[in-house]
């Protein structure tokens, strides 16, 4: 495996050739500047001999059909392995769900991004590949962040693409973080990366980014980089700014960020999440409605169990509507413009 990676510099290809696990860990050096450690399939760490004090996690492929972030991360890994760029920050890349990537599907058995913060081991337990992998990914995050002294900035960008078109092509979800202000610097980093829209979540979740934020105090985000396309069919010119800023972050080049300015970004607050309680749940709007479509107060969004679910605020925008989820799961997130958010 070591020789295959050294020859090809293609970590994604090696991962997909061995989607369940590698036969043990291995490591090697890039010149005298970087130690590379491969912990598992889809798990690779770049340890600079001299680092600048940030611990960066870039994860992708938690959903197997969300290919643009996978190609983006593999491109960065390849540049690092080819020594075209040199890491100056500790960096962990995670390719989340290799089995689903090979399958060309979002999931194998279950939505992995609902299985973190220990949810993987709640009943029925570790009964499918996503649950097993989520537990391992948590362990790799823990190993990475706790291998060095506290006090360093921890960052985790969990990269996705959405199943539908969007009024805002690229957007990020800022996990709930009670008692901690939102980072204006991080929001402006996202804006410089082409991600000009941020949703402030209002409650704990079992997503990957919330896990890193809550457990390790990381500046963590779920980042949606556009729409789902098959592997190899993404227009990677749409990610030039994202690639550039991630490269600057990893190599510790000046980020040259603007000061936080709420007028330069679109900020939303999650006002509620609507979960499914009955099999007859259905939305009243078209199935192909775009993310961030806005509806006025009193509009009937959905019906289930003989009840109507209506817009409660003057206007609410919807993201991720999906009526076909299992009972108990989220069908949609409702948003209002963020006012008085504690951004510093």
Curated annotation (Swiss-Prot):
Keyword Hydrolase found: yes
Catalytic class of the enzyme: hydrolase
Cofactor detail note: Binds 1 zinc ion per subunit.
Keyword tRNA processing recorded: no
Lineage: Bacteria, Pseudomonadati, Pseudomonadota, Gammaproteobacteria, Alteromonadales
Record SUPFAM superfamilies: Zn-dependent exopeptidases
GO molecular function: hydrolase activity, acting on ester bonds; succinylglutamate desuccinylase activity; zinc ion binding
Protein family (similarity comment): Belongs to the AspA/AstE family. Succinylglutamate desuccinylase subfamily.
Cofactor needs: Zn(2+)
EC number: 3.5.1.96
Species in which this protein is naturally found: Shewanella baltica (strain OS185)
Coiled-coil positions: none
Function description: Transforms N(2)-succinylglutamate into succinate and glutamate.
Reaction catalysis annotation: N-succinyl-L-glutamate + H2O = L-glutamate + succinate
Stored PANTHER family: ASPARTOACYLASE, SUCCINYLGLUTAMATE DESUCCINYLASE
Name listed for the protein in its UniProt record: Succinylglutamate desuccinylase
